[in-house]
Amino acid sequence: LSSSASSWDDWIADFKADGYSSSELVAWSYDWTQSNVTTAQQLSTKIQSVLSQTGASKVDLVVHSMGALNSRYYLKNLGGTSYVDDFVSVAGVNHGTTTASWCSWLYTSCAQMYTGSSFLTSLNSGDETPGSVSYASYWSNCDDALTPDTTAILSGATNVEVGCVSHTDMNNDHGVYEQVRNFVA
């Protein structure tokens, strides 16, 4: 899950090369300017569609950047823990970022992503990793979009610092992919 499904093309090719079929791999686009709550509701519908089409009982959910917020909202508030086996946040803004200030006045999603927002306070209250889902967060020590970069860390998750990989390269990097693949395997 990233606002543009095409951002996952490299990893989809990697998963296929490692034996996954096309029917097991779904990339989904969403409108990054809308509320994360709205996106979470749309994600819920998408996951139900995938489960119906595949006959699977659960999915592995791999997300990038803001995708962590709407996905975690889905897990925490919309019953998503019943339908997700593994959750992987790649460069996820789990605790917000000050770089969202450039758009927080214009888009609800950016205001929600800004460090200290009421959305984030609610999302991160209590258990950050609810349910029986296995959680992981992969983050870079030089990600300029995440300020501070430790905002990606989730309490209760497997948190992995991957070294210096840029924000936009995180979900294209083969080394990060290998770690994610091993986590969801």
Where would I find each of the regions flagged by the language model?
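Soluble non-cytosolic domains of exported or imported proteins
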Residues: 1-6, 33-37, 41, 82, ...
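Active-site catalytic motif of lipid deacylating hydrolases and related acyltransferases
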Residues: 1-59
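C-terminal catalytic-base region of ester-bond hydrolases, centering on the histidine
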Residues: 128-185
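Short, structured coil segments at secondary-structure junctions
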Residues: 21, 83, 153-156
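Serine-dependent carboxylesterase/thioesterase catalytic core
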Residues: 36-126
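A structural signal for isolated positions on well-ordered beta-strands in alpha/beta enzyme cores
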Residues: 26, 60, 86-88, 134-137
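Solvent-exposed loop/turn segments at secondary-structure junctions
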Residues: 1-5, 22, 30-35, 64-69, ...
